């Protein structure tokens, strides 16, 4: 590659949010002698208005290359390619005109990322956007001024379907869960078995897969074998259930998440080149997600103190 990464480049007061990129042959390619990347913090749940997106695109067309990436693996809006003199101009317009902040880069807390949560999803076990926003504001210094030995990520999944893949991509993963029984509507179960309701919300209706077989498609695929279907009734052995969501996804009109809701906190997901990808390890099986989130912050700060010494 002809790109030189890094370098001391950024905006005043921030140690992250800008990734310096320089061409190693500026005489041959003067147009991309500087081609810095800027990371812009995404809104909660990635909800946008078309006006907002147009404003960002107009700004980047005017002061950058016009090339964007929606989104980076951390979730940020990625602005690809601008010059050093434009960085402060872009930052000023983002913050003063569009009320928008930069995201994280380098050895800092990366921009927290969440799923749509309770705004749209019936399976969300806690308000992902409220928790994500609260922690983003709480840890502004850690986000904008790198002080860690290595990057650190929060990700928030409202349920175990894990739409932002928190369990695979975060140093602390917040995965929604519940403590009580899955709620079963036996009449709706019978409707699925009888073919009245399409399984999987009708997502596989493009071809004829044959009649729905609850034993084959639900019971036998339960990872802990905690389900049974006998005499027209579905039963679940709750202590053995791992909340994998498969049965709920297949029969969403018959099964619902429980009412005693919160989240599990897991730590340590990473993908080192030599060792290969590693999923998060369960740290806190269940914690209530309630403002002001003091119990959650206590776990975070204990983990953060350890990370300052051991992170790599």
Kindly give the residue locations of the regions a language model identified.
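Iron-sulfur cluster-binding cysteine motifs and their immediate structural context
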Residues: 214-236, 240-264
């Amino acid at each position: 590659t002809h790109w030189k990464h890094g370098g001391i480049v950024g905006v005043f007061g921030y140690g992250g949010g800008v990734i310096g990129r320089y061409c190693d042959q500026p005489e041959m390619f003067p147009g991309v002698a500087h081609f810095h990347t800027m990371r812009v913090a995404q809104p909660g749940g990635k909800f946008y208005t078309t006006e907002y997106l147009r404003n960002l695109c107009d700004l980047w067309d005017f002061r950058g290359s016009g090339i964007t990436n929606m989104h980076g693996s951390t979730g940020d809006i990625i602005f690809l390619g601008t010059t050093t003199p434009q960085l402060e101009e872009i930052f000023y317009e983002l913050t003063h005109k569009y009320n928008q902040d930069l995201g994280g880069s380098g050895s800092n807390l990366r921009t927290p990322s969440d799923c749509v949560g309770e705004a749209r999803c019936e399976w969300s076990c806690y308000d992902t956007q409220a928790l994500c926003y609260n922690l983003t504001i709480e840890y502004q210094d850690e986000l904008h001024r790198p002080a860690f030995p290595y990057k650190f990520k929060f990700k928030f999944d409202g349920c175990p379907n894990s739409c932002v893949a928190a369990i695979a991509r975060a140093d602390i993963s917040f995965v929604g869960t519940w403590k009580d029984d899955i709620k079963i509507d036996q009449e709706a179960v019978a409707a699925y078995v009888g073919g009245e309701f399409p399984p999987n919300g009708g997502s596989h209706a493009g071809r004829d897969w044959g009649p729905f077989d609850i034993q084959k498609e639900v019971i036998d695929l339960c990872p802990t074998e905690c389900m049974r279907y006998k005499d027209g009734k579905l039963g679940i052995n709750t202590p053995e259930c791992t909340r994998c969501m498969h049965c709920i996804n297949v029969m969403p009109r018959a099964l619902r998440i429980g009412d005693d809701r919160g989240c599990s906190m897991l730590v340590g997901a990473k993908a080192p080149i030599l060792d290969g990808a590693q999923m998060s390890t369960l740290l806190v099986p269940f914690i209530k997600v309630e403002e002001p989130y003091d119990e959650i912050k206590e776990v975070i700060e204990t983990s953060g103190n350890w990370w300052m010494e051991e992170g790599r």
